Amino acid sequence: MLFKRKIYDKFLAWKEETCGKKALLVEGARRTGKSTIAEEFARNEYKSYILIDFARAPEEVRDYFRLHLNDLDTFYMLLSVQYGVQLHMRESLIIFDEVQLFPKAREAIKYLVADGRYDFMETGSLISIKENVKDIVIPSEERHIKMYPMDFEEFCWALGEEPLVRYIRDCFERKIPLERSIHEKGMLIFKQYLLAGGMPMSVVAFLEGHKDFGKADLEKRDILALYRNDIMKISARYRSKVLAIFDQIPGLLSRHEKRVVFKRIAEGSTAEQYEETF
């Protein structure tokens, strides 16, 4: 199930404004839909595309980056054969998915963009993409963009409520109240959004389950488990503190001030003890 996302227009702006002179790095939390929207964009806006998922890419593909960047004709030929995709000059996109898992590919962006044959897009998860840069030169030939979960407007689009969105916007711009029954409908959908959340997979579960909040909740729990597993992969120096903060989030959000109070994380803790962790 594909959803309309606002970030698509930002992808279009990048393509038109940079004309291949910069790669696009899409950063965001896991499961916000980065890979899905990147592939949809490639499918719609290019003659062909290659998606290299570094979570699954065979070792031979990684070797292409290690051995053949000094011969880009061979590099592109090997990628084309490996993925069975014909590449077209200035009409093909190459996506480095989960690029944080193979920093060498991100470092190669400098040379690949300078070559100018194809456009490049990278996707990466926030924590890991900042961790895994110690041994590489971060390319300046990147435009960074952050991707977030679906907002309320995108949630309405997913429910097929585009007319409602247009009506709300029109009333807002004209500074007039919504008609009562439409206001009630909008508030009902907003409450559904608050309960189902904006993670694409939880929205899919909600819709495919005929608006079953239980199925959406199960999907959200799976995502939380994934986040906890990701935290366990970061530096041991920060791990326990990050987990402590992560576990405090529901309680922090339930409070009026909605800010981190360090002494509530652990008895006697201070801001200085958590500065590097943040």
Region spans (language model):
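Hydrophobic anchor at the beta1->P-loop junction of P-loop NTPases
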Residues: 26
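Hydrophobic positions on the alpha1 helix immediately C-terminal to the Walker A/P-loop
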Residues: 37, 41
